[in-house]
């Protein structure tokens, strides 16, 4: 056999793997979604994850053997992407699985056969590892396969023993490595040496069950779980130095390089890293969006947003200044569509999401990078090596600049970020935004923790009762335990049982009264601390003492309004999923007495028609009078029935399910109406974005709708009187005014451009001549960026062969720069994007663009003359 493996494309490798196992009785299954069935798992991170319920005995398999090519995403080592040969966020895992059928001997034999016979890997280049106690696997490799003992390495449990958790199925594994340098011999083989070895096939033998004591018992039905990294085996067969230069990824890299006007192979290492990051991350985001993940600030949505932002920033690092991600995404889609047709089918959605996120982040990046550059310069000037947590938090809180991006840029400048200080600033802000009750909560919790061993948890009876006879267990004033308190005192009270709902799940706490013999306490809020319901209120009359028997009574009217609004949020989520997008998920909510608020993950706002349809659907459900079915169910059963759970929420083994059959089913501990008809009517007040990828709907229900409409009527009447038109004529009148304003603005912009061009024409007389080139470097007063760009293009057209660099200060503390180079100047090694980006740094800014035309900005207008002087000097030096 030849000393080198045969050359195959990535698609051919995938097909040959699946066909090999299909011919041996395996069912070929399509890749599962990157969104796992288990809501507690963020993303599909391994080929075996879709089969985990089978391995854990929770589901009976429909077949004994299966083979897949599974899409996976891992971001735990994201900082290593592009810097090592094999770290990626997106990868495909080829796998063959046996559920109680064949086991170790057959799995090893087939693993060796496909590696050596199908893929043609030379046997002398393969090394295998086994678990140090797995004598059976060792013997199979040595005696049946014929691997020499020098090339069988025993490894510890950390490397070669798979577990599903603290208890459950587990077993040893065996890995096959490819040796790039067999000439180094078999003495002292070190499989950790990634310059020589790459592990490409892992065979897991699930043969034990581990109990709570750590004891291993042989399983009656043993399973096989294997994984061959497609990118790794492709690197080996295509004989390239890393995974990125395989035909699975490199075409994406080439597209990015072409947009940037650079060549990958002749680029420096930092540029190659950026190109690799783009190549990898674009694969990830294309498949994530195709699997209906949308960018947001939580969960897998934030993973998507972070990856998109890293693509944009690394594009900037290689000189791409504008939007480019969809050009690169098109290459990724084309590479994937034969194996994963859904990426082409969802192309429009993918590109719309990427375009929106890229445009939004470019604005954030412009502001944040400029400010961070100033911070870094100041830190270095002071001889420090750490960016303060306060500065990092200001970037995050005020300008939306992500902490991890600050850390990444800091690392590039040999600095670190005080993350602990950042977290402290976050805590300070969160505490500063709380009301008086929340500020006291910390003291209350401390006091209750001390008393927890001596008093019982509060019994909540508010689902079925509005009044309770109770005993005062704990009395606090400003969080400090007291035996009694007099009229006029703000108090916190813990009762042994209560009908008051404590703030939870977005629903505010009940209001009402606690009364007794000569005592009246007005309760304004209720919060839950551990197992205790804390009633915040004011003693209106009498003296309250620990041990008093009292009557606790909620404000029934307020409760009715709150529970109507809470049920309305459930109907709202159901309507959004039905009408707008089944992938919509809750990102937060507020249920109060007078209104409701619902935050949800969505890449776009709702259209007027969609808002109307959502309203109509909810009001239809209200009119249909659907009765509630409320049950306590095991969590697994509730999920199996399709109950909606909020991602990231921790649930117990038993959950409360609010079910309006045929309409909505959610896990929820809040209070609700018994029939949708009790809501009365529902009206959406507003729909808007509150964060990138997060939308917010505010709405009212019941009598609050009438209050809202009365206010609207008054506003319409006032506008009608002001414009002296009928209410129905208002839209037309406003449109007319808007059109007139736009016309005026366009005329103004045209005049600005004409003025800039007129100013620039006078510069032709001042052009310097350097050999065959003409150079114009000048400052124009008060010219906006677009007009400045037009002036530079016009000047270059007139001088022909040469370079034009213009600067201006269009407004206070804002510098605008533009460079326009002829093709002959480009041939001298000068690129406008890189050139103007470097010049802009003098003004505390940055930028870039194409080799022939690029724009940049800055914040220090006083440095513009120096920047232009530097530009003049560098151009003369390069072209003279």
From Swiss-Prot:
One of its GO terms (cellular component) is cytosol. The keyword Zinc-finger does not apply. Keywords: Aminoacyl-tRNA synthetase, ATP-binding, Cytoplasm, Ligase, Metal-binding, Nucleotide-binding, Protein biosynthesis, RNA-binding, tRNA-binding, Zinc. Binds 1 zinc ion per subunit. Its cofactor is Zn(2+). Coiled coil: none annotated. Its EC number is 6.1.1.7. Disulfide bonds: none annotated. PANTHER family: ALANINE--TRNA LIGASE, CYTOPLASMIC (PTHR11777:SF9), ALANYL-TRNA SYNTHETASE (PTHR11777). Consists of three domains; the N-terminal catalytic domain, the editing domain and the C-terminal C-Ala domain. The editing domain removes incorrectly charged amino acids, while the C-Ala domain, along with tRNA(Ala), serves as a bridge to cooperatively bring together the editing and aminoacylation centers thus stimulating deacylation of misacylated tRNAs. HAMAP family: Ala_tRNA_synth_B. This is Alanine--tRNA ligase. It comes from Nostoc sp. (strain PCC 7120 / SAG 25.82 / UTEX 2576).
């Amino acid at each position: 056999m030849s000393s080198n493996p045969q050359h195959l494309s990535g698609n051919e490798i995938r097909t040959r793997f699946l066909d090999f196992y299909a011919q041996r009785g395996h069912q070929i299954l399509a890749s599962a979604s990157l969104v796992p069935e288990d809501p507690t798992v963020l993303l599909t991170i391994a080929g075996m994850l879709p089969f985990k319920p089978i391995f854990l005995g929770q589901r009976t398999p429909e077949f004994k053997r299966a083979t897949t090519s599974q899409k996976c995403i891992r971001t735990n080592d994201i900082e290593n992407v592009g810097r090592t040969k094999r770290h990626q966020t997106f990868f495909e895992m080829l796998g063959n699985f046996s559920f109680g059928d064949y086991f170790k001997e057959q799995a090893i034999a087939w693993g060796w056969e496909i590696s050596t016979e199908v893929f043609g890997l030379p046997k002398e280049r393969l090394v295998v590892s086994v678990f140090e106690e797995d004598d059976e696997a060792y013997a199979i490799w040595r005696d049946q396969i014929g691997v020499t003992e020098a090339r069988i390495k025993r490894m510890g449990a950390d490397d070669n023993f798979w577990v599903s958790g603290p208890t459950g199925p587990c077993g040893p594994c065996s890995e096959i490595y490819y040796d790039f340098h067999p000439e180094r011999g078999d003495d002292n083989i070190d499989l950790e040496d990634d310059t020589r070895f790459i592990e490409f096939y892992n065979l897991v033998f699930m043969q034990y069950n581990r109990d709570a004591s750590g004891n291993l018992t042989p399983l009656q039905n043993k399973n096989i779980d294997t994984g061959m990294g497609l990118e790794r085996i492709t690197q080996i067969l295509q004989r390239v130095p890393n995974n990125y230069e395989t035909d699975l990824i490199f075409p994406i890299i080439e597209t990015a390089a072409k947009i940037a006007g650079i060549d990958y192979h002749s680029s420096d290492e930092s540029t190659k890293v950026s190109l690799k990051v783009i190549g990898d991350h674009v694969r990830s985001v294309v498949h994530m969006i195709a699997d209906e993940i949308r960018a947001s600030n939580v969960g897998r949505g934030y993973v998507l947003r972070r990856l998109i932002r890293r693509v944009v920033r690394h594009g900037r690092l290689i000189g791409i200044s504008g939007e480019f991600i969809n050009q690169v995404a098109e290459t990724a889609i084309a590479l994937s569509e034969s194996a994963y047709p859904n990426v082409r089918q969802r192309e429009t959605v993918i590109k719309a999401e990427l375009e929106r996120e890229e445009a939004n982040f470019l604005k954030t990046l412009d502001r944040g990078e400029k400010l961070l550059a100033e911070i870094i310069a100041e830190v270095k000037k002071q001889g420090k090596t750490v960016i303060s947590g306060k500065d990092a938090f200001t970037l995050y809180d005020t300008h939306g600049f992500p902490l991890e991006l600050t850390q990444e840029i800091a690392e590039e400048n040999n600095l670190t970020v005080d993350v602990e200080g950042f977290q402290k600033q976050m805590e300070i802000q969160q505490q500063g935004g709380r009301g008086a009750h929340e500020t006291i909560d910390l003291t209350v919790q401390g006091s209750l923790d001390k008393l927890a061993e001596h008093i019982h948890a509060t019994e909540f009876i508010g689902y079925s009762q509005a009044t309770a006879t109770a005993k005062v267990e704990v009395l606090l004033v400003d969080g400090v335990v007291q035996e009694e308190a007099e009229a006029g005192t703000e108090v916190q009270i813990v009762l042994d049982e209560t009908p008051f709902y404590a703030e939870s799940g977005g629903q505010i706490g009940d209001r009402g009264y606690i009364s007794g013999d000569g005592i009246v306490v007005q309760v304004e809020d209720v919060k839950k601390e551990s197992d205790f319901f804390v009633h915040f209120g004011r003693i209106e009359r009498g003296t309250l003492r620990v041990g008093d028997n009292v009557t606790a009574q909620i404000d029934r009217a307020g409760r009715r309004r709150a529970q109507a609004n809470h049920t309305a949020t459930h109907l709202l989520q159901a309507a959004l999923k039905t009408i707008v997008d089944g992938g919509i998920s809750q990102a937060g909510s507020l249920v109060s007495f007078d209104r409701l608020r619902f935050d949800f993950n969505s890449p776009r706002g709702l259209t007027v028609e969609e808002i109307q349809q959502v309203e109509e659907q909810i009001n239809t459900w209200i009119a249909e009078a659907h009765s509630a079915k409320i049950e306590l169910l095991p969590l697994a059963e509730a999920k199996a029935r399709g109950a909606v759970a909020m991602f990231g929420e921790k649930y117990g083994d038993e959950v409360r399910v609010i079910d309006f059959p045929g309409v909505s089913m959610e896990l929820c501990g809040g209070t609700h109406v018994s029939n949708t008809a009790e809501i009365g009517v529902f009206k959406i007040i507003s729909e808007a974005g509150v964060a990138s990828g997060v939308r917010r709907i505010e709405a009212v229900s019941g009598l609050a709708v009438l209050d809202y409409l009365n206010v609207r009527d008054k506003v319409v009447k006032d506008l009608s009187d002001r414009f002296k038109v009928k209410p129905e004529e208002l839209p037309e009148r406003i449109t007319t005014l808007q059109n007139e304003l736009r016309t005026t603005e366009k005329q103004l912009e045209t005049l600005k451009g004409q003025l800039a061009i007129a100013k620039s024409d006078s510069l032709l007389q001042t052009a310097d001549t350097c050999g065959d080139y003409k150079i114009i470097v000048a400052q124009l007063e008060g010219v906006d960026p677009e007009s400045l760009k037009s002036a530079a293009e016009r000047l270059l057209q007139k001088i022909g062969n040469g370079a034009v660099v213009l600067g201006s200060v269009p407004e206070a503390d804002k510098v605008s720069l533009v460079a326009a180079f002829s093709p002959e100047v480009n041939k001298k090694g000068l690129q406008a994007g890189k050139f103007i980006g470097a010049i802009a740094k003098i003004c505390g800014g940055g930028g870039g663009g194409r080799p022939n035309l690029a724009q940049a900005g800055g914040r220090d207008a006083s440095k513009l003359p120096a920047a232009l002087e530097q530009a003049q000097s560098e151009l003369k030096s390069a072209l003279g």
